UniProtKB/Swiss-Prot annotation:
Homodimer. This is Lysine--tRNA ligase. Mg(2+) 2 binds at residue 417. It is found in: Cytoplasm. It catalyses: tRNA(Lys) + L-lysine + ATP = L-lysyl-tRNA(Lys) + AMP + diphosphate. The keyword Disulfide bond does not apply. Binds 3 Mg(2+) ions per subunit. The gene is lysS. It holds the Pfam family tRNA-synt_2. Belongs to the class-II aminoacyl-tRNA synthetase family. GO terms for biological process: lysyl-tRNA aminoacylation. GO terms for cellular component: cytosol. Mg(2+) 1 binds at residues 410, 417. It comes from Prochlorococcus marinus (strain MIT 9211). Its main location: cytoplasm.
Length: 503
């Protein structure tokens, strides 16, 4: 045990004997720090206002000068200075210096990091700092761990993620990020609800992990002796709801994929999936740019923002261009000219310095590889990349006029995929054929290939109206709107590799 922790434990025992904590039950709060700062800006230097307030929070800093002390108290809204005077405390409490709540207890037993509640009136110091002139105080929680140095904060980035509770105390930007995230989620739900979309929850535990090309987490139900999977998408169940007659439906929730971890990927993440009957992928483009621009204006106050030193303009309309056009523009390769000649397409890619992966077994997959290598990272302004190869889009409807292509788009902002959408495939025969092809890939070793969900195919056989479907990555959108470089900055408790020596 560290000397500092031992000292704080001793102080906690003293407080307990004196009857002042160290762990309070409740405290009646009348005002928040930030509200006081705003509502009493007119209070002149050196003046007091006879408004009695009760404020609670964490002591962030303390300065003791004989019979006078200045503490900074922080609550969820902000911070305010405490003006603590020995004579004032004694005058209002009639306590001797050994009694609970005395000035000596305050200066001797209260440390930075402790939670206290105070009662007093407002006073602006001669230097212009709005303060609470404290009449009485109560210990609410004794902190046994010292806070990081206020000048250097929590400088170890990984420690910020492992001890988010400390990060939130010492880093105002982290608090702002998670507040913005909560407001963003609320704004998305409000926007959808106002347009008659209904949020319905679908299963997290599933007998088949479908709806995306991803490896699932596997668990086991003991009573049923049944292997189950954490969902990798909400798509197939939401489509079942459209079959059942819900014409506008969505779900905002957690997704789980047993994949790598990076600044863009966390195995547990959040999406919103939206389905609209009688719509196609062009309608979903309209919906996407309208909703995201609305959310951006709500959170950032404008549709023009800064991300990592560059300006991003989210004002609609956004650029719409096909994958084929982008690859041709960037590499000079016209993949439509290759037909089904994989060898010719591979040679052409190598001639312009692109890698040809072993798993690319079709021209469509090679075009997608060329896009990912040569184009994707440069799409900084919002861009709808349209018309994807059918081989990589088994749940999307065939394009109405382009063979080998489906009506699908992905939205790219700041070089990252942010949304994915289709004109949904509603032909049950076509759907089953494509899932059988996916099954063949799976049997050949592709563990991310789709599985066949027979009940989903059965639902399509019951009949699903023409539908547009959309999925948006909430975490990546929060990254964009809060200017955060890593997905770990916007997930309160991201998954991390265990520290060395821990179990």
């Amino acid at each position: 045990m560290s000397d500092l922790k031992e000292t704080r434990l001793e102080k906690a025992q003293v407080l307990k004997k004196l009857g002042n904590g160290p762990y309070g039950i409740r405290f009646e709060v009348t005002h928040k720090a930030a509200v006081l700062q705003v509502e009493h800006q007119d209070l002149a230097n050196g003046q007091e206002r006879q408004l009695e307030v009760c404020v609670a929070g964490r002591v962030i800093s303390r300065r003791v000068m004989g019979k006078l002390a200045f503490f900074t108290l922080s609550d969820e809204s902000g911070s305010i200075q405490l003006f603590l005077e020995k004579a004032t405390l004694e005058e209002h409490s009639d306590l001797d210096q050994e009694s609970p709540g005395s000035f000596s207890q305050l200066t001797d037993l209260v440390d930075s990091g402790d939670w206290i509640g105070v009662n007093g009136i407002l006073r602006r110091t001669d230097r212009g700092e709005l303060s609470i002139k404290v009449f009485s105080w109560t210990m609410l929680c004794k902190s046994l761990q010292p806070l990081p140095d206020k000048w250097h904060g929590l400088s170890d980035v990984e420690k910020r993620y492992r001890q988010r509770y400390v990060d939130l105390i010492v880093n105002p930007q982290s608090r702002k990020t998670f507040r913005s995230r909560a407001l963003m989620v609320s704004a998305i739900r409000r926007w959808l609800d106002e347009r008659d979309f209904l949020e319905i929850e679908t299963p997290v535990l599933q007998s088949e992990a479908g709806g995306a090309e991803a490896r699932p987490f596997i668990t086991h139900h003991n009573t049923l002796d049944l292997s189950l999977y954490l969902r990798i998408a909400t798509e197939l169940h939401l489509k079942r709801l459209v079959v059942g007659g819900f014409e506008r439906v969505y779900e905002l929730g957690r997704i789980f994929r047993n994949e790598g971890i990076s600044t863009r990927h966390n195995p547990e993440f959040t999406t919103v999936e939206i389905y609209q009957a009688f719509a196609d992928y062009t309608d979903m483009m309209d919906l996407t740019e309208e909703m995201i621009s609305f959310v951006c204006s709500q959170i950032c106050g404008s549709t023009t923002i800064q991300y990592q030193g560059k300006e991003v303009d989210l004002t609609p309309p956004w650029r719409r261009i096909t994958m084929h056009e982008l690859v041709l523009e960037s590499t000079g390769l016209d993949f439509y000219e290759f037909g089904q000649d994989i060898s010719k397409a591979s040679t052409a890619m190598q001639s312009v310095g692109l890698n040809v992966p072993d798993h690319a077994d079709s021209v469509g997959r090679l075009m997608n590889e060329a896009f990912e290598q040569a184009v994707e990272g440069d799409l900084f302004q919002p861009t709808f990349v349209m018309d994807y190869p059918i081989e990589i889009s088994p749940l999307a409807r065939k394009h109405r006029s382009k063979p080998g292509i489906v009506e699908r788009f992905e939205l790219f902002i700041a070089g990252r995929e942010t949304a994915n959408a289709f004109s949904e495939l509603i032909d049950p025969v076509d759907q089953k054929e494509r899932l059988l092809l996916q099954q063949s890939r799976r049997q050949a070793g592709d563990l991310e290939a789709h599985v066949i969900d027979e009940d989903f195919v059965n639902a399509l056989e019951v009949g699903m109206p023409p539908t547009g479907g959309l999925g948006i990555g909430i975490d990546r959108l929060v990254m964009l709107l809060t200017d955060s470089p890593s997905i770990r900055d916007v997930i309160a408790f991201p998954l991390l590799k265990p520290e060395s020596g821990s179990q």
